């Protein structure tokens, strides 16, 4: 079994930071996921990942990524649905 993805601690830290941002500020709709620069899957017991999806849910709240800036380029990050 390939365990290389499990060793990507940087992705796990960045994703946990973003999850915490939404958890602490449930009304904040801005895309804090911009901080996540990794596009690999990470293992987490309380998350079910859907990679490269444009929308995701946190505690039954739905978030849609909105590109910002002059180029309006979508960032490639992982998304998750809390289960």
Curated annotation (Swiss-Prot):
Top-rank lineage group of the source organism: Viruses
GO cellular component entries: host cell cytoplasm
Keyword vocabulary terms for this entry: Early protein, Host cytoplasm, Host-virus interaction
Locations listed in the record: Host cytoplasm
Expression triggers: Expressed in the early phase of the viral replicative cycle.
Principal location class: host cell
Region described as Disordered: 1-26
Subunit-level organization: Interacts with host IL1B.
Family, similarity comment: Belongs to the asfivirus L83L family.
Functional summary from the UniProt entry: May subvert the host innate immune response by interacting with host IL1B and interfering with its function.
UniProt name for this protein: Protein L83L
The organism of origin for this protein: African swine fever virus (isolate Pig/Kenya/KEN-50/1950) (ASFV)
